[in-house]
Amino acid sequence: MQETALLERESAGTGNAPVRTDWTREEIAALFDLPFTELLFRAAEVHRAHHRAGEVQLCTLLSIKTGGCPEDCGYCSQSVKADSGVEATKLMEVQKVLQSAAQAKDNGSKRFCMGAAWRNPKDRDMPAIISMIKGVREMGMETCMTLGMLTPSQAAQLADAGLDYYNHNIDTSPERYEEVITTRTFADRLQTLDNVRNAGINVCSGGIVGMGETRADRVGFVHALATLEQHPESVPVNALVPIKGTVLGDMLADTPLAKIDDIEFVRTVAVARITMPLSMVRLSAGRESMSEATQALCFMAGANSIFTGDKLLTAANAGDDADAAMFKRLGLKPMEGEEPMRAMKSVGGCSGGCAA
């Protein structure tokens, strides 16, 4: 009876029902426990109620400053704690960044994301960052930055420059978090998300699965995002790319059974779609090792955004040509027009899951 009640309450979040931010862990766990085909059916219903079926947003991610990060994230090859062979670089010149953005636009990307391996940006770097944002926007592309933690003042500067999105992932569940990173707290991450939201910038926040976590951790990860006062406009779901020389990469090389299987990854995408119906759910790192069949299941489960191009920061990624061929085989097309949450904000009709 209790499971039935939970699933009946969960169904209130489907279709055109109000967006919920009061999900319980029990409800989310019940979704994960559904028969796989039933979960996909429910996720597809939610997706079609809020998004255009068959359209997938194309984004490009560029590392504008690689390596040398003082954080100890166990998955990251750019940490100074990792023995990954990644060499630290200086911040890219603005013109080179804009050249990369122009190429991404020519390849069909609508959003250009720029990432720097910093704990937080220094004030001396802000003028160059602002020039990058303005230059990319002048091309008619959406902009996203991921620079580490932000102060309210820095968030305001990025907002004034016209930044559309800021990415700051929560990585995993609050309980698992300290096993992955110790140099920045879970609360620190939430504070940066608050600073971004308060500055009027759209939030991009997700995490990584396949780090040896349990399903309970995946439940906690989705719960942490789905119960934010306002859902992230974008939710990237990464599958860990185990890199030699990183803590987690070396751990999983020795314990391959700790890796997440494809069906469980698709389940995570589906539960994210059901609990955050208006958000863009993005397939991010790890996609290059997924079969087209697995990716097709992810699209059926509600994923409607991908990173395209040959590289994501330091990890390999499916290239533009491979993605174009996959889109043709699956009958998908690049997304046009505004995302649902942004469109609702522009007409003043957003409630429950959108930013003010």
Swiss-Prot record:
Binding locations of [2Fe-2S] cluster: 113, 144, 204, 282
Tagged with keyword Ion transport: no
Signal sequence segment: none
Coiled coil: none
Enzyme class, first EC level, given as a word: transferase
Residues involved in [4Fe-4S] cluster binding: 69, 73, 76
Pfam families with a match to the protein in the record: BATS (PF06968), Radical_SAM (PF04055)
EC number: 2.8.1.6
SUPFAM superfamilies per the UniProt record, alphabetical: Radical SAM enzymes (SSF102114)
GO terms, biological process: biotin biosynthetic process
Necessary cofactors: [4Fe-4S] cluster; [2Fe-2S] cluster
Catalytically driven reaction(s): (4R,5S)-dethiobiotin + (sulfur carrier)-SH + 2 reduced [2Fe-2S]-[ferredoxin] + 2 S-adenosyl-L-methionine = (sulfur carrier)-H + biotin + 2 5'-deoxyadenosine + 2 L-methionine + 2 oxidized [2Fe-2S]-[ferredoxin]
Known function: Catalyzes the conversion of dethiobiotin (DTB) to biotin by the insertion of a sulfur atom into dethiobiotin via a radical-based mechanism.
Subunit structure: Homodimer.
Protein name: Biotin synthase
Protein species of origin: Novosphingobium aromaticivorans (strain ATCC 700278 / DSM 12444 / CCUG 56034 / CIP 105152 / NBRC 16084 / F199)
Gene encoding the protein: bioB
